[in-house]
Amino acid sequence: MDDTQRPENLVHMDMPGWSTTYGLVSKANLKKDNYGAEIQLNAYNNLSIAEMRMYPQDRSKRTMFAYSWPWVTTRFAGLSMNNFWDISERSQINLGGSLGLNYNRSKYVEFNWIFHPGTPSEKTRVLPSLHAGYQLDIQSFHFSGGLGYGHRAPSVSEGYGYYIYNSFDRYDYIGNPDLKNEISYEANASAGFKNDRMGITAKVNYFYIQNYIIGRILSLGSPMNYQSVGVKGYTSLDHAQVFNISLNAHYHIFKQLHGEGMLTYARATDDQGGNLPFIRPLSYQASLHFMHKQFGFQTSLNGDFTQINYSPAYGEDQTPAYTVWNVSADYTFNFKKVKTVVQVGAENLLNAYYSTYADWGNIPRMGRNIFTSLKINF
């Protein structure tokens, strides 16, 4: 970011950043009778650098310089294996895991010492994971269930960031090199039915996450960016819980006409029962598709309900409900033996004014958009 040409700013900022990554991935697949396996080895090296330089309007005064990412090197190497057994024509078991080694080094660790005195410049973490699953097919029905366990290392920003501005909640963020690994426990299940005319599937999963990493307001420290409302430091909650459920369905009304629908819901809470931010409210999608000879017609509705479980404590405000209606039509023909498709349509036909739970600053999404396209398939 370079805002040195904006005269209205009291302090101009120049914030370049670089991230360089190289690595390798190697896979091997094994298959014998009813047993199969995939073994994967991956490794990478990343260097993250971000600078922050402030220029006062009076250039005769001294400028301020800091590293937002203080030359952080990350090296990772991991080995994973996934095994599956067809125990019958109708059922299968999956079992696997991985073991990774994550190394971090901050070249200019003195920036981290301001908030975390004496923290070491280097840190090595062991990242294990395990998962198991079972699938069962009975005629038109399908069932599955699974369990998982895994570790996640803090990201570069979570561990070593220094006054990184988040425009969503308008806070400057400070990393913490002493954060523990996030430890996740997962349970998931699904059930479905499908025949020649229709299908319906329900999926549910639950996560219990120890040492959940999130930003909390700090009582010490002043914001660096003049737009900031405060400073947050990354810290670990004792735990967090995340629950997701979805329902998908499709139905062929007759040969030329079919419909699809989806309903999803998520809920996430911290160790005090408070809401976590960036969790989508109850949402839906529904569509109809009609085909007759070379003609096609599609219409769809999608939207979110009002965000009830939002999180003011983490800088989030409520997002109202919205619905978006889209329509389109197309015609397919051959032009000199080349398949050609002409399409016209409208997105957000009713010109709904809306933003989603994930849009920073509540900046509205696109309004009514009428389009046409020509596709030529050689």
Regions found by a protein language model. Name each.
Residues 38-138, 146, 153, 163-166:
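Signature of Gram-negative outer-membrane beta-barrel scaffolds
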Residues 12-27, 76-79, 174-180, 186, ...:
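Outer membrane beta-barrel strand-and-loop segments of large Gram-negative receptors
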Residues 83, 127, 181, 187, ...:
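Conserved C-terminal beta-signal and adjacent last beta-strands/turns
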Residues 1, 39-47, 95-101, 145-149, ...:
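Transmembrane beta-barrel strands of outer-membrane/channel proteins
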Residues 24-30, 79-85, 99, 132-138, ...:
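Residues on the lipid-exposed face of transmembrane beta-strands in outer-membrane beta-barrel proteins
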Residues 31-35, 88-92, 137-141, 184, ...:
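Outer-membrane beta-barrel channels and translocator barrels
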Residues 89, 93, 101-102, 205-209, ...:
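Gram-negative outer-membrane beta-barrel transporters
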Residues 49, 102-114, 138-186, 206-229, ...:
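Surface-exposed extracellular loop regions of Gram-negative outer-membrane beta-barrel proteins
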